[in-house]
Amino acid sequence: MADNKTENTLSSDATEVRAQKLKLLREQIGDVYPAHFHRSLTNAELATRYEGLDPDVETQDIVTVAGRVYSSRNSGMFMDIHDASGKIQIFSHKDVTGEEARALLPMIDIGDIIGVTGIVRRTKRGELTINAQKIEMLTKSLLPMPEKWHGLSDIELRYRKRHLDILTNEDSKLRFQQRSKIVSGIRRFMENDGFMEVETPMLQSIYGGATAEPFKTHHNTLKLDMYLRIAPELFLKRTLVSGLTDKVFEINRNFRNEGVSTRHNPEFTMMECYWAYADYEDMMDLVERLFETLALSIHGTTEFDFGDKRLSFKGPFKRVPMPDAVKEVTGIDFLAIKTDEEARAAAKAAGFAVEKDWTWGECLAFIFEEKVEATLIQPSHVTHFPKDISPFAKEVPGEPRLVERFETYCNAWELGNAFSELNDPEEQRRRMVEQLEQAHARGEKEKQLDEEFLDAIDQGMPPAGGLGIGVDRLIMLLTNAPSIRDVILFPARRSKAD
């Protein structure tokens, strides 16, 4: 085994030093990357077990732990090692540590993963410590940790090398632990509410369920062009038709070949559900119960900070029809406007640039997005959307231009979208044909009518409420993350060459 003079014989380059140490270790101990190591407990379990141990007390208990070296002091006499659950201090001294283990100390660098067996004690200063009797090299790290282990300052590097970001940034580590807790919480909530989870195709021969640009691929064996799904909606509705369950949900990825921003990633996570014999008001109640449950699980309260804002997920949320919201902010009364031409004229008179072929509903939705969204800071349900932009929703009784649809907003972000689902097969076909014609007019020639879905609707779908929630944006709010890339473990990015 190497002695304390080893460092003097090694290169001055940090990476080369580690490579030379690895070579020496291979010569002296053989396997530097063993297949298995048995630890008796995690660092967090150790801390819990000895929480009541008084300062300056040494036990007779021998434990085995493992983790990555994050700091080393006094030539390795004191080391802090971290596992996923926390850290523990390691003490090595000739009075307690075997000669072979002490000889290994000069070969250990920050970032190496080691296993330690020793006696548990608490120092005079109150630090829980293991007096190392045996130290084993489990993984030799060939690269130094970044910036003296205080985290990555380069934002793009954090996304490109997420493993280093989490290794060196406790906030990032906590955020992804919370993400896991939130996704598990959504699944548990839905199951406890009687919903059955299913998995629908990610590769689809006909894309639908939303208006978005898809990713296209080709199946060689089937000789078939296919698309990564933009939404699972049509398959989930077919599941509802099947009678498998009256309450169905899915948590999975959607893909949209569109722009990247602080709120948009081409690959994102959605929770989508359908509830037979319910309507959009039932879905509002479900959203409020779910959001409140998640806030309590992460923060212990329904109120929490996002940036400089104090948000509350305590229901009931504000509910406002879209025409009323637009009238309140802009003064334009869309319910008093009767034609598409009048709607375009009113929008232009108010200073909005609208397209010459836009409908009444498209003008209303555009002005809402331009002027109203930014005012919706606390959780709010915006209801009564235009039918023009909502082909799968039931009409509002007495107002055929509007449908029973809502979107949930918070911090001016859309978090959820829900309908009283259209189940009239003739009306569904008429709207989908109209939507297809509009898509073809925009140049989307590959867009097709999903006859298999329409066939299922002909079979008879029960009245139902449907809901989609953007899981990534919800996690952003609950974890105080300014960008969607902060909550996606490996977000979309340009190649390193770019």
From Swiss-Prot:
The keyword Nucleotide-binding applies. InterPro entries: Aa-tRNA-synt_II, aa-tRNA-synth_II, aa-tRNA-synth_II/BPL/LPL, Lys-tRNA-ligase_II, Lys-tRNA-ligase_II_N, Lys-tRNA-synth_II_C, NA-bd_OB-fold, NA-bd_OB_tRNA. It catalyses: tRNA(Lys) + L-lysine + ATP = L-lysyl-tRNA(Lys) + AMP + diphosphate. Binds 3 Mg(2+) ions per subunit. It comes from the Bacteria. Its EC number is 6.1.1.6. It is found in: Cytoplasm. Gene3D superfamilies: Bira Bifunctional Protein, Domain 2 (3.30.930.10), Nucleic acid-binding proteins (2.40.50.140). SUPFAM superfamilies: Class II aaRS and biotin synthetases, Nucleic acid-binding proteins. Homodimer. This is Lysine--tRNA ligase. It comes from Rhizobium etli (strain ATCC 51251 / DSM 11541 / JCM 21823 / NBRC 15573 / CFN 42). The gene is lysS.
